[in-house]
Amino acid sequence: PKLIGDPRQPAPLAINATFEVLGHAFRLDGPVLYATTDPVRGERLREVLVFPPATVTPARDAAMSVNGKPAPVVLRVRAGRDGVKGSVTLPVPAGWRVDPAAVPVELAKAGDETTARFAVTPPSGAAAASLRPAIDVDGKAWSFREHVIDYPHIPVQVVLQPAQVRVVPLQ
């Protein structure tokens, strides 16, 4: 709520520097940035990000199970660092079924991607449910989705949010 009205999230890493020139103190505050050069767009500035080992972003925000048939849930798994080995899971409420129970993933480089596919079957008469996909890396579960906002006229922004997919049974 305290970020409402702000055009962007605060920088995850910031620097504070104090200088003294001719007896006057100056303080500079700002985000930690790095620059890359694109052959078409020229210099591009990006914030240094604090990132989880991997993200699990649903291909769609909702999936439908029609007449008791499994609802397909597709997740894009992206490495946030080199050498990610883990297992993607999709926990479901009691009485629901998910196949497979887990999808092993191995991503060599930061930025590498793969897809994890699940089939979710709700029990008869079940109401819609929000599921939280997660990836277990080094014994810790991470459940973040990633959205990259990249337009030529603004700095690249990466938004991390809790990963969630809604499964809706239809009769």
Residue ranges with predicted function:
Residues P1-L170:
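Long beta-sheet-rich domains in secretory-pathway and surface-associated proteins
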